Design a protein with these regions (language model features):
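Amphipathic alpha-helical dimerization/coiled-coil segments
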Residues: 1-5, 26-27, 77-141
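Short, hydrophobic secondary-structure boundary micro-motifs
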Residues: 34-35, 65, 96, 100
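Short coil turns linking two alpha-helices in DNA-binding domains
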Residues: 45-46, 52
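Alpha-helical residues within the helix-turn-helix
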Residues: 40, 57-58
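Divalent metal-coordination and catalytic microenvironments
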Residues: 49, 56, 73
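N-terminal helix-turn-helix DNA-binding core of bacterial DNA-binding proteins
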Residues: 4-45, 67-79
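Short, Lys/Arg-enriched C-terminal cap helix and immediately downstream tail that follows
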Residues: 60-63, 68-69, 84-86
């Protein structure tokens, strides 16, 4: 991931409404939600939400599919995982024992973090790279 893409993602998520909508859609996984359900869950007017969903979709953070007269939104989870990989790719400068101590107090699931091993600072050696997972799943920002 390029620094500019990460910066754009953080700028978009600096809006409370966008952050809430994105987290809700991450929670829903591949099922996603239609816009009206999102508006109801977040207790905001659909017209207000529409603006935020459009911004997230245009940036590639959400995908949208038409279902009759409804639009179903889904979080681009591979992009989220790519961001986590970008943030952690040089964690603890290759000293996994430091990462282990820090992870023990973190609420982040080990399932989304790179394995603690001698490859800690070398994501290209992870069993399955996030680039392979997200290949063609999110547009360039």
């Amino acid at each position: 991931m390029e620094k500019g893409i990460a910066t754009t993602i953080f700028e978009l998520l600096s809006s409370g409404v966008r952050l809430d909508a994105y987290r809700l859609l991450v929670k829903k996984g591949t099922d996603g939600m239609v816009a009206g359900e999102i508006a109801s869950a977040l207790d905001i007017p659909p017209t207000n939400l529409s603006f935020h969903l459009k911004a997230l979709t245009q940036a590639g953070m959400l995908t949208v599919t038409q279902e009759g007269r409804f639009q179903r939104y889904r979080a681009n989870i591979p992009l989220m995982l790519d961001l986590i990989a970008y943030l952690t790719e040089e964690c603890c400068a290759g000293h996994p024992e430091q990462c282990a101590d820090l992870r023990s107090v973190s609420r982040c699931s080990d399932a989304v973090l790179p394995p603690l091993a001698s490859t800690c600072a070398q994501p290209e050696k992870w069993p399955i790279t996030l680039t392979e997972i997200s290949n063609d799943n999110h547009p360039s920002l």
